[in-house]
A protein has these predicted regions:
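Acidic, surface-exposed loops and disordered segments
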Residues: 1-168
């Protein structure tokens, strides 16, 4: 047991599942149901961000056709593990996230004008907070007993074109 385990307010098994044994997965077993996928998102959305914003968008890729299109956009080292995963999630962010202000911070609209006035600020804030939420997503995956294999080796412009053709 480490000092971190001794100081944690959650039990050691949870610390192990979320952190100590949570290495990036390269192989997967079992299935992920729609209910389990929803539970992952439900946990993710409550993680703290600036203004409690929720810019992260999760696109679950289940169909063989969609998965094949995604796999074609990945670097060679990521293709086999993505093809064999029971569920794949594309994590992106809503480029107009601040338009949902009343949903995540009702009654306190003053800061929204700051983001409406600066596309660069809105983009950087949305991107940064979506990265926080991506971390929460991985923690949610691990806390529900699943493996996670985050990756960055991909042609993201091709993924955007295929999965987000409207550009948002």
């Amino acid at each position: 047991m480490t000092v971190a385990h001794e100081e944690a307010v959650i039990d050691s098994a949870a610390v192990d599942a979320i952190f100590a044994e949570a290495r990036t997965a390269n192989a997967f077993t079992g299935e992920v149901t729609e209910q389990q996928a929803r539970a992952i998102y439900e946990l993710t959305k409550f993680g703290p961000t600036a203004f409690n914003s929720q810019p992260l968008r999760v696109t679950y890729v289940r169909s063989d056709e969609s998965r094949a299109k995604l796999v074609d956009s990945l670097s060679a080292g990521n293709r086999a593990k993505t093809a064999s995963a029971p569920l794949v999630a594309i994590l992106s962010y809503d480029t107009s996230w601040q338009e949902q202000w009343d949903n995540f911070l009702p009654g306190y609209n003053a800061p929204k004008a700051m983001y409406d006035a600066s596309a660069d600020l809105a983009a950087s804030t949305g991107n940064n907070n979506a990265h926080l939420q991506a971390g929460y997503f991985i923690l949610a995956v691990r806390s529900l007993g699943f493996a996670a294999g985050p990756m960055t080796g991909a042609d993201f412009a091709a993924i955007d074109k295929e999965f987000f053709p409207a550009g948002d």
